[in-house]
Amino acid sequence: MAFVAGVIRRLDETVVNRIAAGEVIQRPANAIKEMIENCLDAKSTNIQVVVKEGGLKLIQIQDNGTGIRKEDLDIVCERFTTSKLQTFEDLASISTYGFRGEALASISHVAHVTITTKTADGKCAYRASYSDGKLQAPPKPCAGNQGTLITVEDLFYNIITRRKALKNPSEEYGKILEVVGRYSIHNSGISFSVKKQGETVSDVRTLPNATTVDNIRSIFGNAVSRELIEVGCEDKTLAFKMNGYISNANYSVKKCIFLLFINHRLVESAALRKAIETVYAAYLPKNTHPFLYLSLEISPQNVDVNVHPTKHEVHFLHEESILQRVQQHIESKLLGSNSSRMYFTQTLLPGLAGPSGEAARPTTGVASSSTSGSGDKVYAYQMVRTDSREQKLDAFLQPVSSLGPSQPQDPAPVRGARTEGSPERATREDEEMLALPAPAEAAAESENLERESLMETSDAAQKAAPTSSPGSSRKRHREDSDVEMVENASGKEMTAACYPRRRIINLTSVLSLQEEISERCHETLREMLRNHSFVGCVNPQWALAQHQTKLYLLNTTKLSEELFYQILIYDFANFGVLRLSEPAPLFDLAMLALDSPESGWTEDDGPKEGLAEYIVEFLKKKAEMLADYFSVEIDEEGNLIGLPLLIDSYVPPLEGLPIFILRLATEVNWDEEKECFESLSKECAMFYSIRKQYILEESTLSGQQSDMPGSTSKPWKWTVEHIIYKAFRSHLLPPKHFTEDGNVLQLANLPDLYKVFERC
């Protein structure tokens, strides 16, 4: 069989352009990189990026640069149209980011592009739409600010395979943040911001007057910024200059963070990375890497920038000599900063595997019981003189006075809807936590409490017994089971509503979150918390606890936050309600939050009143779900009327309520079910946790008040000891990372102290 030669045909221009566009624009982050470089070439000082669905649905980038002339709008999206060079020889001295005229053209071939632009001498702005590089209609005059606004919609709408390959919006959004973050570090005199469409808070935000170190701190955190070394060298023979910041020997990460700019262009260089990491190998632990930000300025005639479609690679003369010079300079800087080294040690927790792989043998220290047949002698340094099961008298003396917001307010315990989350979490041996009473008992007990403290609400208390059968509607009727809880004699009242019949939740997302909590549980740490003896509070954030012969310092804030998160996940849609007797307007709460420095509001975010109205309308749309699943009740007028009751006799710190409302609208992922439940639970847990800034220390009180007869000087301490840490015993599954991030620290061990003091 003879082979027939194929016919060579000229490809259609549209096909050629679409193929070329697929090379230049590989993902949304590439498109944003190209447009940011155009903004920088236009002398912009403020660049704002807004994206939707990781940039696949919408990319909007706005600058305050020079703008585009109306006469140029006809050809601005055609290939090989640029204002930055005219002849090929101009490449030898090119100092701008763009030079081929392919960025906007490539984007217009794979997306719908709209450009709104205004020049300094223009009387108005002009808007034009483009498809396949061609102007769809004559530019229309419109209102607009100085600069250019480019809107890119439905990226890769005509390349189905590429769109299917980029199916993870979160991953694409992460790459966008990475690109913008790197350019913001290099261009410290320019303001950058990135946020999702509809969000009020930017995920990346830098200020025009911020330094390079400030931007590194904003993007990568304090852990990097406080360990930086400034580097800089120049070699006139090789015609290059280098400056930047590198991490010292105290800082290391699992993956190298390398920001390299050559002639202000973000590029990659495997050879330079390898040369620098060779230097760090002598200073950092094995399999760890440094943070590197380097900016090389090489004579333009020595650099070839036209070697890759995406421009992420460049070639330059004397490459080996320049790399060697940079390597030597960094080595000299590290050598001079190696006079001291900081190490973070982790004390071995009881029962953890030691270097030999064997678990540490627990020292029980309890005197030999009558059932012990061994008769082994217990030495003084092994003896535990406390019992985690013993109760204190003040546990029954609930404070009446209020110094902080997070303590229970009713003189008698208020029965809530706290039920066991799962058989794994429910520990039968916990005799101290208040168990949920039977419906009849709840009605009787509520009636007795009302007779003693709130006579005027006895009628409501008698209705606490549910009238619906187990098989009736799954909706909760909280109004018939209200129990008034007095904050103080003259203050506002709140209502704790019980929900005694448990709903069965079979949502896959919730079950998955429960499984994740169970899988990351640290059994040894759980055993310690279950059998600990509370020693005392250091401050609202830290507390001391003893387990066997060891003394631990525990981060109450982080542990309580994890506790409430797990309660929200395991008791999902089964909460009682803390109902405010006077509804709290969401608008007022949002305004209070925006007035707080914690919100991070600036004038660029828009008027506070408009943001507050948006928050109210947004949360009103989510009111049904919030009430059904989380017992956060919002009425039709936009008032907050109820909060979830997570633990009996515990009221969250209401000083944090405004920020909580703000973060509900801005920090929760409302697009995906699992992420929504997870982030909403975390925000709610953060609000309920013990937080130092919302606790009023007794040292700030006047001596006259603290010396008043019958006053309790430390009610928040009572709450921490008898409510929060009591809940840790039976309801907290501590995650493994608590043993590594400093939230649980071992301070002392009795046998080790005995070696020093030789007595106990």
UniProtKB/Swiss-Prot annotation:
Per UniProt, the ranges with Polar residues bias are: 400-409, 455-472
Where is the region Interaction with EXO1? 412-654
Q: Where in the sequence does UniProt note compositional bias of the Basic and acidic residues kind?
A: 417-428
Keywords, sorted A to Z: Acetylation, ATP-binding, Cell cycle, Chromosome, DNA damage, DNA repair, Nucleotide-binding, Nucleus, Phosphoprotein
Q: Where is motif Nuclear localization signal found?
A: 475-478
Question: A single GO BP annotation from the record?
Answer: homologous chromosome pairing at meiosis
Compositionally skewed regions (Low complexity) per UniProt: 363-375, 434-446
- Annotated residues that bind ATP are located at 38, 63, 82-84, 100-104
The GO molecular function terms of this record are:
ATP binding; ATP hydrolysis activity; ATP-dependent DNA damage sensor activity; chromatin binding; enzyme binding; guanine/thymine mispair binding; MutSalpha complex binding; single-stranded DNA binding
What InterPro entries does this protein map onto? Answer: DNA_mismatch_repair_CS, DNA_mismatch_S5_2-like, HATPase_C_sf, Mlh1_C, MutL/Mlh/PMS, MutL/Mlh/Pms-like, Ribosomal_Su5_D2-typ_SF, Ribsml_uS5_D2-typ_fold_subgr
Positions of post-translational N6-acetyllysine modification: 33, 241, 377
Say what the protein does.
Heterodimerizes with Pms2 to form MutL alpha, a component of the post-replicative DNA mismatch repair system (MMR). DNA repair is initiated by MutS alpha (Msh2-Msh6) or MutS beta (MSH2-MSH3) binding to a dsDNA mismatch, then MutL alpha is recruited to the heteroduplex. Assembly of the MutL-MutS-heteroduplex ternary complex in presence of RFC and PCNA is sufficient to activate endonuclease activity of Pms2. It introduces single-strand breaks near the mismatch and thus generates new entry points for the exonuclease EXO1 to degrade the strand containing the mismatch.
Q: What is this protein called?
A: DNA mismatch repair protein Mlh1
State the species of origin. Answer: Mus musculus (Mouse)
Taxonomic lineage from the root: Eukaryota, Metazoa, Chordata, Craniata, Vertebrata
